[in-house]
A protein has these predicted regions:
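Bacterial carbohydrate/catabolite-sensing allosteric modules
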Residues: 1-179
Length: 179
């Protein structure tokens, strides 16, 4: 597609979340979410994978909870983690809604977040700060993304012959109760 593109930066803060978990003793860190759902989920999975490989903690790769194409995702997620022989001690999730579904499934299985298992989401949705426990998440700066999108559009209108641009906006890890 010949067009300007705007994305949020998915990699750095996922890697920072994994580093935070490792620094606090977590060794079996897994990913939850359908990596094939969209490009952002795939980038987040790859950032997670690179981070755990960097720390030599590849055990978590064998227990990723990635049901795909499911109509009832919460049930599929529950069924996936219920079958784990060894439960991870932390999860990085594709977004906050996956993280909240995961916390509910873990609670149903008798695990406590964060006492037994840590969970980190992505998007810093409004629901993440109200959810119990308050969800650690990676904040997307929506206002900056909106401004940047408008700027890209206005520049394209004024200078249609410019090379197409790909712009990434910054994200930030927000630590809350779930880690």
């Amino acid at each position: 597609l010949k067009a300007d593109r705007l994305y949020m930066e998915n990699r750095i803060e996922i890697q920072n979340a994994v580093a935070h978990m490792v620094q606090r003793g977590k060794k079996h860190i897994s990913f939850a979410g359908d990596k094939n759902h969209c490009q952002s989920f795939f980038e987040r999975y790859m950032a997670y994978k690179d981070a755990v490989e960097h720390f030599g903690l590849t055990e978590g790769l064998s227990t990723c909870a990635m049901p795909s194409g499911q109509q009832n995702y919460p049930v599929s997620l529950y069924e996936t983690i219920r079958r784990f022989k060894t439960m991870p001690d932390a999860f990085v999730c594709a977004n906050d809604f996956v993280a909240m579904d995961l916390v509910k499934a873990l609670n149903e299985l008798g695990y406590s977040v964060p006492d037994d298992i840590w969970v980190c989401g992505f998007d810093d949705s409004q629901e993440a700060s109200y959810f119990a426990p308050h969800l650690t998440s990676i904040h997307i700066h929506g206002q900056i993304m909106g401004y940047t999108a408008a700027n890209l559009l206005m520049t394209r209108i004024e200078e249609p012959s410019l090379n197409y641009r790909t712009v990434y906006t910054e994200t930030n890890l927000i630590l809350r109760e779930s880690t």
